[in-house]
């Protein structure tokens, strides 16, 4: 080794402290029976077919239309 070369010593690796913690795995899945029994009528709808077509003649709709019309006549 020459005078200009310096010896580089590798640093000791720092190992993270490992705690002796017991890992409790709660990954067990509970199995449930199927809700659909054989031969059962499955025609029951989850949602109403007309869920987005509410009554357009209810009180709220009438008040809303009147308010919109009054604001549109004010701007004109």
Swiss-Prot record:
Keywords: Proteasome. It comes from the Eukaryota. One of its GO terms (biological process) is double-strand break repair via homologous recombination. Residues 30-40, 47-57 have a biased composition (Acidic residues). One of its GO terms (cellular component) is proteasome complex. InterPro entries: DSS1_SEM1 (IPR007834). Pfam families: DSS1_SEM1. The keyword Secreted does not apply. Residues 30-62 are annotated as: Disordered. Subunit of the 26S proteasome which plays a role in ubiquitin-dependent proteolysis. Belongs to the DSS1/SEM1 family. Part of the 26S proteasome. This is Probable 26S proteasome complex subunit sem1. It comes from Dictyostelium discoideum (Social amoeba).
């Amino acid at each position: 080794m020459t005078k200009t070369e310096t010896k580089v010593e590798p640093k000791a690796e720092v190992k993270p402290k490992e705690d002796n913690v017991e890992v409790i795995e709660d990954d067990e899945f509970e199995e449930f029976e199927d809700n659909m029994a054989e031969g059962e009528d499955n025609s029951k709808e989850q949602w109403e077919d007309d869920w987005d077509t509410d009554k357009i003649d209810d009180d709220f709709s009438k008040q809303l239309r009147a308010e919109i019309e009054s604001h549109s006549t004010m701007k004109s």
